[in-house]
A protein has these predicted regions:
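Short linear motifs at protein or domain termini
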Residues: 1-98, 207-211
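C-terminal all-alpha effector/ligand-binding and dimerization domain
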Residues: 112-113, 153, 160-211
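Amphipathic alpha-helical repeat elements characteristic of tetratricopeptide repeat
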Residues: 10, 14, 86, 102, ...
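Hydrophobic packing residues in well-ordered alpha-helices of helical domains and bundles
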Residues: 81, 105-108, 124, 128, ...
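Alpha-helix C-terminal capping/termination sites
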Residues: 98, 120, 184-185
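Hydrophobic side-chain positions on well-ordered alpha-helices
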Residues: 19, 115-118, 136, 182, ...
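Amphipathic alpha-helical segments enriched in hydrophobic/aromatic residues interleaved with Lys/Arg
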Residues: 105-119
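Hydrophobic, amphipathic alpha-helical faces that serve as interaction scaffolds
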Residues: 84-100, 129-166, 201-205
């Protein structure tokens, strides 16, 4: 029964994650255990576990008397997401890059190409997350990688929200190419600097006027 609850919780968490990231569930939207349990035909136990998973991914917040709600996307939240991701992804990259094999570099390049070939913002953002995950996976630091998975999903919410407001068109990501080039040349410090600058872009774009 415990394994069944965990499987159901994962299914619920994945479905709600997609709704939050896509914007179908807007910031501060309430999530009620009884409603979610009824929708998925489950007890409250896997719903509570799903909510814990979503909170660990920075997608929902739980507060006394307010219950569980979709995490906000205000300036303060954006700054927090960006600063955490900037710091943690560089730590992961510094530990991952010395372990790269040709297979790792090929995976990074494949994600880059898929992002370049994306025809929709959803396709682009899926490939973008794959690129950033491929950069750091060899670091072999599971807790750090789990935190970064959540931060990338939170970042995707920002990207998709901005795309809905400002529109999106296919483009080549020059930052990604420069990062990959530096890594191929074993210029790890330079790659980390490029990654920091690249990850900070989202906060600048989220400011009024994109300044």
């Amino acid at each position: 029964m415990q394994d069944e609850n965990l499987t159901t919780a994962q299914r619920i968490a994945e479905a709600i994650t997609e709704r939050i990231v896509s914007g179908a569930l807007p910031p501060d939207a309430p999530l009620r255990q009884d409603h979610v349990a009824r929708e998925f035909g489950s007890s409250h136990v896997p719903v509570r576990e799903a909510f814990r998973q979503l909170e660990a991914l920075y997608l929902v917040v739980a507060a006394p008397r307010r219950g569980v709600r979709v995490a906000p996307l205000d300036a303060k939240s954006t700054k927090e997401i960006v600063e955490m991701r900037v710091a943690l992804e560089v730590i992961a990259l510094r530990n991952a890059a010395p372990r790269y094999t040709p297979t790792h570099l090929a995976a990074i390049e494949l994600a880059l190409i898929e992002a370049d070939n994306a025809e929709t913002i959803s396709e682009f953002e899926t490939a973008n997350r794959a690129f950033h995950r491929a950069l750091v996976t060899p670091c072999a630091m599971p807790r750090l990688l789990a935190s970064l998975d959540g931060l990338r999903l939170a970042n995707s919410r920002l990207v998709l929200a901005m795309a809905r407001n400002a529109g999106w068109r296919p483009r080549t990501n020059q930052d990604h190419r420069l990062i990959l080039q530096a890594l191929r040349e074993r210029q790890i410090g330079h790659a980390c600097d490029l990654l920091t600058r690249h990850n900070q872009t989202i906060e600048r774009l989220a400011r009024p006027g994109g300044a």
